[in-house]
Amino acid sequence: MSMKSQFERAKIEYGQWGIDVEEALERLKQVPISIHCWQGDDVGGFELSKGELSGGIDVTGDYPGKATTPEELRMDLEKALSLIPGKHRVNLHAIYAETDGKVVERDQLEPRHFEKWVRWAKRHGLGLDFNPTLFSHEKAKDGLTLAHPDQAIRQFWIDHCIASRKIGEYFGKELETPCLTNIWIPDGYKDTPSDRLTPRKRLKESLDQIFAAEINEAYNLDAVESKLFGIGSESYVVGSHEFYLSYALKNDKLCLLDTGHYHPTETVSNKISAMLLFHDKLALHVSRPVRWDSDHVVTFDDELREIALEIVRNDALDRVLIGLDFFDASINRIAAWTIGTRNVIKALLFAMLIPHKQLKEWQETGDYTRRLAVLEEFKTYPLGAIWNEYCERMNVPIKEEWLKEIAIYEKEVLLQRH
């Protein structure tokens, strides 16, 4: 049976449940995923005075072909984007500034240091998102930044975050799509603290100072990101979920939920509906934690599908900003981007092809047998036929065909790098 015939047959199967496949494919086209640049160079960045990777973050593996220049990183991103259906965004950290061979401290960064990224994004029709980098730096070596007891160090990081928001505003204005500027800090303690309140008070005061700088929200959206623990902050993290949830609600900021930043038995999918009742928007960093915040490449697993279901069934595609955050240096880095991003898009398609109205009715009337049975049956409905058609229409390879492109690129480009 031809691929087109498989698609038409699958359309009929889904259509029996009142699911409009064509409408789902049109909706899917409109959903941008924010693809993190740091998978391409193992969270290295391009600072001239480069610090060791810190902040409780670790990248394992030594696969050949890592990008070592901005040009190489952009070229690799272009390759990945050519294999991923849809129009998307690229997420940058401050350490990816281009300073023309001059040492520019992070609190002195300006929009001009990202002009090449903006020109590139314009050329490819991409949005850009941004993050201040509060790790891998001499002034973060003791694991404290915005909550540091030393006012001078604290001010350095406050100024860096203010500079980052201005860069985000520049991105949004130039590219005519709001930039999400997200603040994550590594601050915490390895062992049990004797005072949990004071560092949080300092963090609150730092954030208040950062957000007091006026920025046009039409161009820049502010987000704050929590974490349960990191290497070196096992016992206490200043920016906990409760801290940022409260701060975001009170100050009208976005909460960003990273799927690897919670207890292993705690799921982000279970938080989305609760937060949508109280927040206009929220943001995600989709990752795959294996026993801890290991940032494995995202797979098409139960939690990814459940996150997609929560977004789609609650009609929140325009309220939940979806980004990625994983890094694996043990496999081809362009393949890592491709696998993870395609899986997120595939999960959204899966969620769009579910009879949500009927399932909700069964839940409301107490028919839990039908609810469970049908949800399980839909796991083996012909999603693959619809996905292949979508990829074909979006001019990207179907199924695993994209691996051929990766193999050619690896041989001709990646393995030539030294």
From Swiss-Prot:
State whether keyword Manganese applies: yes
A Pfam family cross-referenced in the UniProt record is RhaA
Q: What are its cofactors?
A: Mn(2+)
Record pathway: Carbohydrate degradation; L-rhamnose degradation; glycerone phosphate from L-rhamnose: step 1/3
Task: Write the record's keywords in alphabetical order, separated by commas.
Answer: Cytoplasm, Isomerase, Manganese, Metal-binding, Rhamnose metabolism
Major place of residence: cytoplasm
Keyword Manganese belongs to the record: yes
Gene3D superfamilies named in the record: Divalent-metal-dependent TIM barrel enzymes (3.20.20.150)
Known catalytic reactions: L-rhamnopyranose = L-rhamnulose
A single Gene Ontology molecular function, please? L-rhamnose isomerase activity
Q: Which domain of life is it from?
A: Bacteria
Residues annotated for Mn(2+) binding in this entry: H261, D293, D295
Task: Give the UniProt subcellular location, in the record's own words.
Answer: Cytoplasm
EC annotation from Swiss-Prot or TrEMBL:
5.3.1.14
What does the sequence similarity comment in the record state about its family?
Belongs to the rhamnose isomerase family.
Q: What does this protein do?
A: Catalyzes the interconversion of L-rhamnose and L-rhamnulose.
- HAMAP family listed in its UniProt record: RhaA
Question: NCBIfam families of this UniProt entry?
Answer: PRK01076.1, rhaA
Name of the protein in its database record: L-rhamnose isomerase
The scientific name of the source species is Halalkalibacterium halodurans (strain ATCC BAA-125 / DSM 18197 / FERM 7344 / JCM 9153 / C-125)
User: Which gene name belongs to this protein?
Assistant: rhaA
